[in-house]
Amino acid sequence: MKDLLNLFNQQRQTLDFDAIKIGLASPALIRSWSFGEVKKPETINYRTFKPERDGLFCAAIFGPIKDYECLCGKYKRMKHRGVVCEKCGTEVTLAKVRRERMGCIELASPVAHIWFLKSLPSRIGLMLDMTLRDIERVLYFEAYVVTEPGLTPLERRQLLTEEQYLQARQEHADDFDASMGAEAVYELLRMIDLQSEMARLREEIVVTGSETKLKRLTKRIKLIEAFIESGNRPEWMILTVLPVLPPDLRPLVPLDGGRFATSDLNDLYRRVINRNNRLCRLLELSAPDIIVRNEKRMLQESVDALLDNGRRGRAITGTNKRPLKSLADMIKGKQGRFRQNLLGKRVDYSARSVIIVGPNLRLHQCGLPKKMALELFKPFVFAKLQRRGLATTIKGAKKLVEREEAEVWDILEEVISEHPVVLNRAPTLHRQGIQAFEPVLIEGKAIQLHPLVCTAFNADFDGDQMAVHVPLSLEAQLEARALMMSTNNILSPANGEPIIVPSQDVVLGLYYMSRALENKKGEGMVFANTSELKRAYDNSVVELHAKVKVRITEIETDDQGLRNKASSIVDTTVGRALLSEILPEGLPFVLVNTEMTKKNISRLINSSYRMLGLKETVVFADKLMYTGYAYATRAGVSICIDDMLIPIEKKEILGEAEQEVLEIQEQYQSGLVTAGERYNKVVDIWSRTNERIAKAMMDTIGTERVVNADGEIVDQKSMNSLYIMADSGARGSPQQIRQLAAMRGLMVRPDGSIIETPIKANFREGLSVQEYFNSTHGARKGLADTALKTANSGYLTRRLVDVTQDLCVVQLDCGTAGGLTMTPIVEGGDVVEPLKDRVLGRVVAEDVLLPGNDDEPIVTRSTLLDEQWVAKLEEAGVQSVKVRSPITCESPFGVCALCYGRDLARGHLVNMGEAVGVIAAQSIGEPGTQLTMRTFHIGGTALSAAAIDNITVKTSGSVKFTNLKYVEHANGTLVAVSRSGEISVLDTHGRERERYKLPYGATINVKDMAEVKSGQILANWDPHNHPIVSEVAGFVRFIDFVDGVTVIEKTDDLTGLSSREIADLKRRGSQGKDLRPLVRIVDKKGNDLTIPGTDLSAQYLLPPRSIVNLQDGAPVGIGDVVAKIPQEASKTRDITGGLPRVADLFEARRPKDPAILAERSGVISFGKDTKGKQRLIIKDADGSEHEELIPKYRQIIVFEGEHVTKGETIVDGEPSPQDILRLLGIEPLAAYLVKEIQDVYRLQGVKINDKHIEVITRQMLRKVEIVDQGNSKFLNGEQVERQRVIDENAKLIARNELPAKYNPVLLGITKASLATESFISAASFQETTRVLTEAAVRGTRDNLRGLKENVIVGRLIPAGTGQTYHSQRRYSSVGLTESEMETLVGRSTSSGTEVTSPSKDAIPLGG
């Protein structure tokens, strides 16, 4: 019996494997796969349609065409299983063996495998140490190669032309062997003794001096090492036997009309077989050499085309002029095996239809058309019909269903109750694009969708379609209900804020009912409770917007957790009091006693989730929605053209602007301003004007004059329909209303530059023909941009997912002490993101102490910061917190829960097995479509208008200096003499409120820790000149000042004062080229003074174009300006914005002119310049010097004698992330990447949590570069996975040997994806050929650790609920007990770790 059951399993290969290994196939292995040799190119007999014997479809080789039936029909049925027919040679078995039985072709002459020859770097070339060009000349019969020199002066692997060969034959007769073609290469490869070659190279690498040779040797050592370790032989890269793919994988299908559709592979195989057979015949006939050679070359070319068509020479085309699809093309690209069939499969039990709005559904429901449900749940319905006895057979049940009998519908109702379905809207950019709902049967053919989940799906009802899938197994249903149900996805995983927020109509309704208006019916009435008020409202005694007093009863929770009722009389409006009726118990009335704009509603739902948990919030969100719709209907808001009020001031503002433009035009004509300045100023004037008119318009629309209850005339917010919509956040924005009622403003040309004549009209007035034409320009560009943007954004998401796909939470605590220090983010003096927002949901890395009290920790190490904790931190005035980060996590694979912190979508500590990598990739990729594509062009004045020349405080408090070096001027002010100094303002609690950068040479009007008032000016400076400040008091002495050569004297006509300007280098002529004009400060006797704290003389090198106003010998005091350098309006640097910028950062691309950072700390001096470069020298503390050559056109921002620290900017520009990592380390790099990426997203108003960017940065830092190999087997300069080096070093240290030293390397996301340990994942991403070639040579083993690899081999992913399956599978093979397994999977927490976290409604995931 057991064998009978085994019958079905014989064909199934085992699924229980732990790894997949790839390698080179030896000829013996290929022959062992084969079931016979394919000798003829024929496919099938066109009369009988039966396969030809020994042909490409031969039944004797590949198996029978029909199950259990031989080709000639002698043996049929199961009883002859396994018999080989003596007449036709077919084995009687299942026909599906034709999918797995391979054949082979014995090649008459060896052939090189094109992947190992042409895929760069050429493996055959490296192995033989010959160039690819030379090998190709041998292979394609253009030259001889010496395979065995014997005793002749010839070298092995030396190439000989035909003449040289004949000459050598004459000279040396048969003393040497030389041949051509793949045989020659095969011989050379066969002779290589890998071990001795390896030893020779290891010796050579020690003595070699040349850089290029070293690189070549390193590559060869790696390759030979790979061959030795994997057990591959070099000659296997040359094929002597060619495997033939099973016929069912390259089918030949008869079409009607007697023609055949065939796979391209059959054509390619036919070509190879034809040429091979012809070559055999020629060799038998011992034909002339030239003919044989030609045939061999053609055979090589046809095998090349079969393996990878088009890689060498022109691609072989079929009858229809398109290139044939070779074996390589089958697996690579979007249509290849990996991406088309293994990573994206089509599934059954699915349907799709248009979606319509379902405003009366509950949040967990969706409306499913009856017809669709019946089709989807058919098998369930059949089973139930049979169980009920309404049908006896499946056939009978089928008939009932087809006739759509009445009882079928009742049964369908029962079947679908409590059976969730999964809805999906393409494009699925993040995990909220697929959610589970309980179906409700509806009439019609459209799917009803709950309005609150539209944001998550990014769906609207203008014809969008959605797909429905049915989870069949019990496990799938359970997961759909527990994890994917729409009620479990209230918070966005990107930022932890509610994603189930009302929008549009609902917001409008709630806003309308919560507005307060003056002098409405019933104003000033007092009500005992809300039900009394409701009665009054229903009887039209009070109006909805009247201001009234109501007694509200609330439930309050005190410190002990006891719940008490508290009632109070509140000033409110009728609408808000009615709104309080749906407020769940435990939420304060304050939350709704305000205008319910979209922001406030979001805050309300967030508070509800944090205070009351999931279930209450879901019910509340539904009630909010129903209320919103009801009152939107009552409001009856509509817009008409009269709602667009054009401000009266428009005419006069336009007049002023036109006047200004005329003035500038005149200045330009008289030559006072350049064309560029004129353009910039004009654009500036118009954008300012536009803003003024827009403000006037918003004031006009947004306020109205009314008489209040006391008879006075007052202004109140108007109820203008347009204004209501924009103000509530329901639809539209001030920008759009501006175009309707103020002026359209400036338009953009397709290249992104601004047209200087604005559109003065608005849409209500109507545009003139010319204005309309101008506006079409930019509009078309916008549409083209959108299309490109979607593609680019999708590609970015794909790369991000690929680099992070194997990152999961693998343990609770890795025990690291490292982390990142978080501080508030400040821009232009304002705090953009306070500290509490940055550390919320993070785990503290070390105790946080009270500022000014080092004994008392507020928060202890390893605490998860929730809302209560961050409030405490803010109260205490903490300015920086060190938190755990994925970047510093020390888990070998994946990250640990404490380094990751809170799961943003659930609000508690992240669960074991959560796929945090994919979530990070989706959170960053999904808003990609909202980012802009264009680079911003910023002209001169657009910037110079905003040239800041002082610091004015916005809040009162005390001043704190950070990193600030300053000297005290004689008049009592301080002068800044450092570049990276900052001034901050702290409030009474010591919390930082503002922070400003101070430029060099700024005058500071306050002392450190001084009290300041709001509006006070702390510091000021000249924005147009960069001063050089003297740090000592003494007398000026000019050095190398030669009039007319290095300096030009200028006298001002008005004042008569003279000043000297340092001449440009080009103008100095030959005698001035070695002069270095500088100002030295000396004492009375003329001795050099030194800068305090150093032994450098106080001298200041003057760069070209700097201006000196002092005379030689004049006295200077501390803090006086010695010279100043005019700053031209900063060069227009295009700011790359939007998507391209994000992509550049993640790809870790070096900017075009990167900032030059100081390689070490020390004091600056300048050396002798070369032709196009200036020489900058940094002298460090122990006197060693480091030189840096800097192009003349770059502006150096440091001066002689200035002290710089390692990694400080010395030449302005965009810093390169690689430099930051090398000079400053991982933490500053992380801070830089997070800041730069967040800046782009913040500009678009997109919120993404920092930890997602950190997760991706972690993956970019996976590799390290070996700087000193120690006793390890790594080579210097090799890039290796960090974890491999750590493991290897641990072994070395255990044996008391020298460990390898290494530096972290930053790889871009594409590079990092391709450099992953898993070759299956890398091959399915990009450059499939290269990845597989490399992996085969190394004999790589893929341990199937990531998500992609497991999807490809058809298993559950090792994340989420699939992690338990994997751990059980692993340990069942080891045979552990239950308790041991629990310990391993990570139930236990590491010692000394406490995790404090409120886990409300937590759904524990496997683990």
Curated annotation (Swiss-Prot):
Co-factor requirement: Mg(2+); Zn(2+)
Disordered: annotated segments: 1384-1407
Oligomer status and interactors: The RNAP catalytic core consists of 2 alpha, 1 beta, 1 beta' and 1 omega subunit. When a sigma factor is associated with the core the holoenzyme is formed, which can initiate transcription.
Similarity field: Belongs to the RNA polymerase beta' chain family.
Binding positions (Zn(2+) 1): C70, C72, C85, C88
UniProt protein name: DNA-directed RNA polymerase subunit beta'
Enzyme nomenclature, EC number: 2.7.7.6
Keyword Zinc recorded: yes
Alphabetized SMART domains for the sequence: RPOLA_N
Stretches with biased composition (Polar residues): 1386-1399
Manner of cofactor binding, per the entry note: Binds 1 Mg(2+) ion per subunit.
Residues the record lists as binding Mg(2+): D460, D462, D464
GO cellular component term of the entry, any: DNA-directed RNA polymerase complex
Coiled coil: none
Gene name, Swiss-Prot/TrEMBL: rpoC
GO function term, MF aspect, one: zinc ion binding
Keywords for this protein: DNA-directed RNA polymerase, Magnesium, Metal-binding, Nucleotidyltransferase, Transcription, Transferase, Zinc
Source organism per UniProt: Xylella fastidiosa (strain Temecula1 / ATCC 700964)
Chemical reaction(s) catalysed: RNA(n) + a ribonucleoside 5'-triphosphate = RNA(n+1) + diphosphate
GO biological process, one term: DNA-templated transcription
Function: DNA-dependent RNA polymerase catalyzes the transcription of DNA into RNA using the four ribonucleoside triphosphates as substrates.
Residues bound to Zn(2+) 2: C814, C889, C896, C899
